[in-house]
Amino acid sequence: MFAKTYGATTLGIDGRIIDVEVDVSPGLPGFELVGLPDTSVKESKERVRTAIRNSGIQLRQERVTVNLAPADVRKDSSGLDLPIAVGLLASYGMVPEAAVQGALFSAELSLDGNCRPISGILPMAITAREHGLTEFYVAPSNGDEALLIDGLKVYAVENLAQLVRHLTGVETLSPAMPQATEQKKDAAFTDDFADVQGQYQAKRALEIAAAGGHNVLVVGVPGSGKTMLARRMSSILPELTKEEAIEITKIYSISGLLGKDTGLVTTRPFRSPHHTSSTVAMIGGGSIPRPGEVTLAHHGVLFLDELPEFSKKTLEVLREPIEDRQITVSRANATLTFPSSIILVAAMNPCPCGYYGDKNHVCECSAGEIKRYTRKISGPLLDRIDIHIRVSRVDYNDLHTTQRAESSAAIRARVVAAREAQRVRLKSYDLFCNAQMNHSMIKKYCRLQSDAEGILEAAFHRINLSARSHDRIIKVARTIADLDGAQEIAAKHIAEAIQLRSDIGLNID
């Protein structure tokens, strides 16, 4: 007898519906699993048979063939255990075929028949709805994640025996309901700019970066607060939209980083990989590519501390995600494109010992050592970073002042207002910040007053700007004007943008 159920796997950050076709026929007893299964799926036939037996269900010894279609897609999800088991029971006539139509099954089975959670439930739920399926059977720990998508009846199934009783009408399971949990209000941040005394220029630069989605390089001596500033960047970014939150949750679900009963991710990611991270860890990879750090930081902040300590190869692969806001990973089995709309915040010392240019410490590095150190970061990579700032030690009086510094909430209010102006301006392009503008958009939306043009032209020749640097300065100036509520870019806006590009002394341009 033939039966068909639906399972799912993931490809990139999207779900893929898998037709599970089961045929039971007379002949030599056996269990064949075909359709390009990966190792974890090949092992499922042993888990399924043992789970069925330990659930108190006896099957006749016949020839079983399971086909996972489409056959040209590699299946690598242990979540196919449940649809294979249900399909097998349906082919034996133990479960009505009508009861499994229009339903997606996705859970790993333990040997005693219990349902275990898997990664990637959210993209599977989205794909199920797109394919017109109406019911989704998952492990209890995956219930909240599946409920993020409207239009599906989600059933949290404890074990295979319970599911069989439900499908045969012996027991009725009620659809899972969202748990009434309080969403965290991120108005009160753990890391707040109010804790940072002094460093006014650096805080201003990060505000501009947050408002326009610009990348930032912070150069300073040890103890000047580079890391402290960077870790507060997320606190001044606008709240996530529902679409952004779902996209981030999909990525974390695929990566297995979504905690139990986490539900929707509501805070912007902040990723800070160690400088020993490999290229694969940074951009993603594997035989079937999985997201790397640039994708895990999507719609958030990627912080690279001690930038020159990263391998040159790892740094150079950042060019594509910074420029295109996506990264393409090619492997023998698949070529996938992952999103990477990030704000890069990089920090570094000015020299190997860290004290070049410091008033209180003598730098022990030779000119050659400093040159080799700064050359670890290529010109093309630095050219893609919009804002370059240098920070010095915090003044004693700033450290001991009784006046509280401006809070993240106050800075964020200005950032949100500037972002709204950009959203309205760029809505026809489906863009949301100035950093995403291309050259034609810059010409259309970035009108410079005559004196501002004069300042830009002088800077272009004086500091030998590249065409890319020229455009990035204009985009930063447009953001500064948006923070001021100005329609045109004035001289003061372009002057500040130029200062934020050329004030770190690394001979970048």
Tell me what each language-model feature is.
Residues 1-217, 224-227, 330, 469-470, ...:
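Peripheral, non-AAA+ core regions of ATP-driven protein-machinery
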Residues 18-24, 282, 386-389:
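Short beta-strand elements
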Residues 37-45, 58-60, 67-77, 288-289, ...:
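Basic, amphipathic alpha-helical bundle interface domains used for macromolecular binding and assembly
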Residues 59-62, 99-100, 132, 150, ...:
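Short loop/turn elements that form and flank the Walker-type P-loop nucleotide-binding site
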Residues 207, 264, 269, 279-302, ...:
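Conserved alpha-helical scaffold flanking the Walker A/P-loop in AAA+ ATPase domains
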Residues 218-259, 324:
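Walker A/P-loop
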Residues 244-278, 285-286, 392, 432-440, ...:
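Conserved inter-motif catalytic segment of the P-loop NTP-binding fold
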Residues 299, 305-306, 317:
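Walker B catalytic acidic pair
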